Amino acid sequence: MRTLWIMAVLLVGVEGSVIQLGKMILQETGKNPVKYYGAYGCNCGPLGRRKPLDATDRCCYMHKCCYKKLTDSNPIKDSYSYSWENKAIVCKEKNPRLKEMCECDKAVAICFRENMDTYNKKERINTKIFCKKTPEPC
């Protein structure tokens, strides 16, 4: 519960793609992004990449890999242009660097929706103590 509170505090007043990512997740899944994915499994949240526990956790793993490929981007400060059209995320950003960030966020939001059947409530707030530190390569 403490982790969830900390994640909520971190998101308050934050601008940039972190907020846009949360909106995308809400639009794609209908779920509160902080509550359902803020500390899920071994890869969702601020800690480094670890071996994914399930398909939902793999979504976060792949999102971190996607962000790792970005150069000169700051997901906390940078924001991009996107819209929700006909129940689909459309990245409208002209800046190539920010468009890539938008595409990373879009991919994880869609991944969460496509893997909702693998979501394990027991992993919602994972302390990551028992997560294997050797991740697969991106």
Curated annotation (Swiss-Prot):
PROSITE patterns: PA2_ASP, PA2_HIS. Keywords: Disulfide bond, Myotoxin, Secreted, Signal, Toxin. The record marks F130 as: Hydrophobic membrane-disruption site (MDiS). Snake venom phospholipase A2 homolog that lacks catalytic activity. Induces mild local edema. Is myotoxic. A model of myotoxic mechanism has been proposed: an apo Lys49-PLA2 is activated by the entrance of a hydrophobic molecule (e.g. fatty acid) at the hydrophobic channel of the protein leading to a reorientation of a monomer. This is Basic phospholipase A2 homolog Tpu-K49b. Residues 1-16 form the signal peptide. PANTHER family: BASIC PHOSPHOLIPASE A2 PA-11-LIKE, PHOSPHOLIPASE A2 FAMILY MEMBER. Residues 121-133 are annotated as: Important for membrane-damaging activities in eukaryotes and bacteria. It is found in: Secreted. Belongs to the phospholipase A2 family. Group II subfamily. K49 sub-subfamily. Pfam families: Phospholip_A2_1 (PF00068). The record marks K128, K133 as: Cationic membrane-docking site (MDoS). It comes from the Eukaryota. The record marks K121, R124 as: Important residue of the cationic membrane-docking site (MDoS). GO terms for cellular component: extracellular region. CDD domains: PLA2c. Disulfide bonds join C42-C131, C44-C60, C59-C111, C65-C138, C66-C104, C91-C102. It comes from Craspedocephalus puniceus (Flat-nosed pitviper). Monomer. GO terms for molecular function: calcium ion binding; calcium-dependent phospholipase A2 activity; phospholipid binding; toxin activity. GO terms for biological process: arachidonate secretion; lipid catabolic process; phospholipid metabolic process. Expressed by the venom gland.
